[in-house]
Amino acid sequence: MSEDHVQNDSQIEAVFRVNDSHKHKKDKEHRHKEHKKDKDREKSKHNNSEHRDPSEKKHKDKHKNNDKHREKDGEKHRERDGEKHRDKNGEKHRDGEKHKEKDIEKHKEVEKHRVKDGEKHKEKDVEKHKEKDVEKHRDGEKHKHRDKDREKKKEEKMKSSSGGVKVKKENGFSSPVRVKDEPEDQGFYVSPKENKAMKRPREDDEDYKPKKIKSEDDKKGKKRKQEEEDIKPKKKSKAKGNEEGVKKKKVKKEEEEKWKWWEEERHRDGIKWKFLEHKGPVFAPPYEPVPDNVKFYYDGNLVKLSPKAEEVATFFAKMLDHEYTTKDIFRKNFFKDWKKEMTTDERNLITNLSKCDFNAMSLYFKEQSEARKNMTKEEKLKIKAENERLLQEYGYCIMDNHKERIANFRIEPPGLFRGRGDHPKMGKLKKRIMPEDIIINCSKDSKIPVAPAGHKWKEVRHDGKVTWLVSWTENIQGSIKYIMLNPSSRIKGEKDWQKYETARRLKMCVEKIRNTYKEDWKSKEMKVRQRAVALYFIDKLALRAGNEKEEGETADTVGCCSLRVEHINLFQELDGQEFVVEFDFPGKDSIRYYNKVPVEKRVFKNLQLFMENKQPDDDLFDRLNTSILNKHLQDLMEGLTAKVFRTYNASITLQQQLDELTNSDDNVPAKILSYNRANRAVAILCNHQRAPPKTFEKSMMNLQGKIDAKKDQLADARREFKSAKADAKVRRDEKTKKLVESKKKAVQRIEEQLMKLEVQATDREENKQIALGTSKLNYLDPRISVAWCKKYGVPIEKIYNKTQRKNLLGPSIWQTTTSNFNAEQRCFS
């Protein structure tokens, strides 16, 4: 210890020499500051931010002086200073425990003498730093220096006798003042790391915001760049998030604005609406004559047609490559109506359609069609914008203070009538509809649509018991055409809802109705017997009533009540079955209905009775018509019609077929095939047929080519998998195992793709002559399909496309369908 004291004395003398010139001034300041010490300490806790700037400035000035003083003190002071800073940051163990104890004692000796001369004039905020740093430092060292407490006390007494000042902390313990926190010119270097560490004791000051110091600028070049790079993506993601948020808000707003009509009370007494306002129809654009270089020839001679005759000629020219123009009835009807539009001279000249040359006109319209396909993006956008403008202006109406979409707000342009099936009036001219042909329907208190300039409406009505907005009579069959609301509208939704609910009610009394008509087979009245047999056919075969016509239905179709003797054949036994009836007649759209069905013996006997003494073109049910049948159906159940029977039988057939065909272990494509097969059974029941598409054979060849290519791909994948497995047995390393797993997954993926293609081919082949969409959209209760999808995990998008989901699956239907495929939700069990 004597050697240590000698060494310490020499150090103290060196320190005294440096500070001797300031001694008297500091003593004076010390006496003044000691008086306010306690008060200032308390005050500094709340005013750190006010004193930080001047204290930081002093720190910077004193760092420069410390650098100069450190050069004078030499290596000895550097080691001592390094040990001092390592003590603060917890790095004391690097230089060994042996030197640490000795250096700590020397360090404390020097600090005590410095406190005597230099610590008196410290600033208030710096003294607070010092006390808190010392307190933290002591907390970290108290376990290591517990055995040396007595020695420290003795040393403190010695220094106090020499005039040293003790700095008393808030916890009541004396602690040496640390050199590293000394802002004075004491010849010690304060590193940026040490200064940075000083921020920790200020954690209790909530308002304190550490000021960046110059010594950190070296690190901040790269760091700041990284921070900027980190910030940019965040801003981007935030912007993206905002966009998504806006989209979600828009979608949510649209959902909120959607009319929840199913929650409102319905109008009574047949009232469909109380307020209706719209802008009227959009008429077809006027005819634009073809250019002069587009010639028409008759019998090899150039003929200049009048505008009206030329317009009708263009209708035929546009269809020149179609099979319709080869049909005699089409050509005959066209030529007859075309001559009505000709002038007298043209009628006298053009007497034979076969001598007319429409090739130049046809070529011109083909070029026009190609030009439309090759339009620039800007041209297409311009047309799209114009269509959108018309849609916003004419495509919506206000019904009962709600905006509703109109289905077909454009008047059909003039052209040639094609009809459904082999219609006898195909080829006739559909005349241009003018405002004078139009009947407007709207509410009295609405703004009545304005007719085009120079024209007026035929009539304006205010009939709230009908759902159409505009009507006119077309000239081909004299039928009335309408502009109606979109299928997603309230009126259409209510109509569909009522139709399916009526079919569900029929389930409750269908057995009673069946028992009734079976009893009527034995009635003494021929009228009752015919009615009972017709109802049996409607129930069992889902036949249409006959004269019951829907919009656009042609006049040459045959239904149940309009069957003639020539349409059926009776077989006592056929193909091992008794009492077989063969039906063969043109159904709706002139589609042939051909079916052989075994019937009840009583029905068979009645049919023989009905056919007695009748010619082939005589009515089979000569005592029955649709009015009599519908009246009887209404007596059996309110709202019951032949169409309700078709809806009921179609829906229950779908439900039964889904139960039989669906396998819960199948994958989604196989389940969809099962659904389509169930749908196919319904389409066959309802006779929803179609002609095979012209491109069917070509599309099947392309599909078969894809299947063959996929099979080759699967064979290659299996070979690679087998080879990888063989390598894995030899190498037995992780990389080979991963390769085997990858090849295995590739085989499974290709197998699944092949199966999808094969299912698609089967589906197409089975349904090439079956129209699945008609029954799906008009006769099948959507709740059955929705419940099936939920039960078997099939996306509803695989069953209904976007438009169908919007129009058919209204919110009311969705809300009443749960994921449980139970008897209540199955609708018809």
UniProtKB/Swiss-Prot annotation:
Localization per record: Nucleus
Bias (Basic and acidic residues): 37-58, 68-159, 193-220
Keywords: Biological rhythms, DNA-binding, Isomerase, Nucleus, Topoisomerase
Function: Releases the supercoiling and torsional tension of DNA introduced during the DNA replication and transcription by transiently cleaving and rejoining one strand of the DNA duplex. Introduces a single-strand break via transesterification at a target site in duplex DNA. The scissile phosphodiester is attacked by the catalytic tyrosine of the enzyme, resulting in the formation of a DNA-(3'-phosphotyrosyl)-enzyme intermediate and the expulsion of a 5'-OH DNA strand. TThe free DNA strand then rotates around the intact phosphodiester bond on the opposing strand, thus removing DNA supercoils.
Quaternary assembly: Monomer.
Family: Belongs to the type IB topoisomerase family.
Additional remark text: Eukaryotic topoisomerase I and II can relax both negative and positive supercoils, whereas prokaryotic enzymes relax only negative supercoils.
Protein name: DNA topoisomerase 1
Organism whose genome encodes this protein: Xenopus laevis (African clawed frog)
Lineage of origin: Eukaryota, Metazoa, Chordata, Craniata, Vertebrata
